[in-house]
A protein has these predicted regions:
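Short beta-strand segments
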Residues: 102, 136, 144-146, 177, ...
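Well-ordered secondary-structure scaffolds
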Residues: 10, 166-169, 173, 183, ...
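Short acidic, glycine/serine/threonine-rich loops at helix termini
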Residues: 85, 103, 110-115, 146-147, ...
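Acidic, glycine/proline-rich low-complexity segments that act as flexible tails and inter-domain linkers
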Residues: 1-81, 301-308, 312, 422, ...
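Phosphate/diphosphate-binding glycine-rich loops and adjacent basic-rich segments that engage nucleotide
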Residues: 138-186
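Alpha-helix C-terminal capping segments
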Residues: 40, 87-99, 180-185, 220-221, ...
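Glycine/serine-rich anion-binding loops at beta->alpha junctions
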Residues: 70-93, 97-109
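A glycine-rich helix N-cap at a beta->alpha junction
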Residues: 116-142, 212-218, 222
Length: 427
């Protein structure tokens, strides 16, 4: 009742509620009332930090103290075609920054990094803790499933937020994301906050509020924290799928593929290097990161990482070894003009229906299917020119996807106003 009446909760009260709920001593109906009160009344920063720490202490934490060097972690608020980790992590790992990631699987319109990695023949995401820590120390990077039970409190709270309609609350989002990031043990945390159609925060103001809150909570908890706000009014890069996204990541690391994906990785990477004290400023950091592509060290690191997790490193040098879909079909543009908008969420759902994602937790994935976009926002297109290529398991699925994908594109006679991809950096 205290929060309902608009009062702040004490540290002890917050801890009592989170612990009690996690242990099953506080029933769902009481916790639902608390979530509704937080949703309507909000929380101040001290309460948000207390909530974050209480949720974090509800699970195990990852002890990286035995790992030498600077440890960094990146979190993305999600997005379609988001293969950032596959490019960014090898780049910074080749420069000596250690990155240990425990990832989730994809559900719905966003693909999980683990599913993308599992499209590489032999790749193993299930590592015992000992090997997880040994790999991050020796290779400099590890991306695996949840070895430790880092977030039992968050899982339980999230499920309840989902059914009570309290997902879009800043203190609840911040405590959910930051409890996991703090539990993951890194010194430097960089947050990739998406804003726009394909994301959770539809406006720049909302994204800025969320990013600022997360950065402040990270700093209060003693971590170097930065957030980058990026536009998500279209999928990131060109590929959406699993093996197709791995192919795009490889092409980017080979320097063959320039897109906003590379720009994002350079920006996030520069934040990590400057925060870690490995570069004097963003310009120096970007030069170091570009060098890892030019000299092949980032690609080599990706292959080393794949081999260290039982995957076939040859697939990194010869992407023809990755799974491929038997049917490819072009999506002709219905009109001439400029691409104004690509509905990211809908593109993700097209990929999911092709078999590239999960509608439910138990769905199986077809690693070869997906979509490769040829025309992105701002680009001119002629009627009949290919907007994208559908990669499908059979002709019928491909034809259905062609119609669905055509509907994802908005084409206008005039060029749209150019909007910057990177909206803001919050330090």
């Amino acid at each position: 009742g205290k929060k309902r009446d608009g009062q702040a909760l004490t540290t002890e009260e917050i801890r009592y509620v989170v612990d009690g709920y996690t242990r099953g001593e506080i029933p769902d109906y009481q916790m639902s009332a608390m979530l509704m009160a937080i949703y309507f009344r909000g929380m101040d920063r001290r309460e948000t930090l207390d909530l974050t720490m209480a949720v974090m202490h509800g699970g195990e934490t990852l002890d990286l103290s035995g790992v030498s060097g600077v440890k960094a972690d990146k979190h993305s608020t999600g997005g379609v075609g988001d293969k950032t980790s596959l490019v960014l992590v090898p780049m910074v790992a080749s420069l000596g920054v250690k990155m240990a990631k425990m990832s989730g699987r994809g559900l719905g319109h966003t693909g999980g990094t683990l599913d993308k990695l599992e499209s590489i023949p032999g790749f193993n995401i299930n590592l015992p803790m000992e090997r997880f820590l040994e790999n991050v120390d020796r290779v400099g990077m590890v991306i695996a499933g949840q070895t430790a039970n880092l977030d039992p409190a968050d899982k339980k709270l999230y499920a309840l937020r989902d059914v009570t309609g309290t997902v879009p609350s800043i203190p609840l989002i911040v405590s959910s994301i930051m409890s996991k990031k703090l539990a993951a043990g890194a010194d430097v945390i960089v947050l990739d906050v998406k804003c726009g159609d394909g994301s959770f925060m539809k406006t720049l103001d909302d994204a800025r509020e969320l990013a600022t809150e997360m950065v402040e909570i990270g700093k209060m908890a003693g971590r170097k924290t930065v957030a980058v706000i990026t536009d998500m009014d279209e999928p990131l890069g060109h590929a959406v799928g699993n093996a197709l996204e791995v192919r795009e990541a490889i092409a980017t690391l080979r320097g063959e593929h320039k897109s906003e994906l590379l720009e994002l990785c350079l920006t996030l990477g520069a934040c990590i290097l400057t925060q870690a004290g490995l570069a004097a400023d963003d310009a120096a950091a970007r030069a170091m990161l570009e060098q890892t592509i030019a000299d092949g060290s980032a690609l080599k690191k990706l292959a080393e990482f794949v081999a260290a997790q039982d995957g076939d490193p040859a697939a990194i040098y010869d992407p023809a070894l990755l799974p491929a879909a038997p049917v490819q079909m072009e999506v002709p543009s219905p009109a001439s003009g400029y691409v104004r908008h690509i509905a990211a969420t809908d593109v993700g759902l097209v990929s999911m229906r092709l078999g590239g994602g999960r509608a439910t937790k138990d769905s199986t994935i077809d690693y070869g299917v997906g979509i490769v976009l040829h025309k992105k926002v701002d680009e001119p297109v002629a009627a009949g020119e290919s907007l994208a290529t559908i990669h499908a398991a059979d002709e019928a699925a491909a034809r259905k996807a062609v119609a669905e994908l055509t509907a994802c594109y908005t084409i206008t006679p005039d060029a749209p106003p150019a909007a910057p991809f990177i909206k803001a950096i919050i330090r």
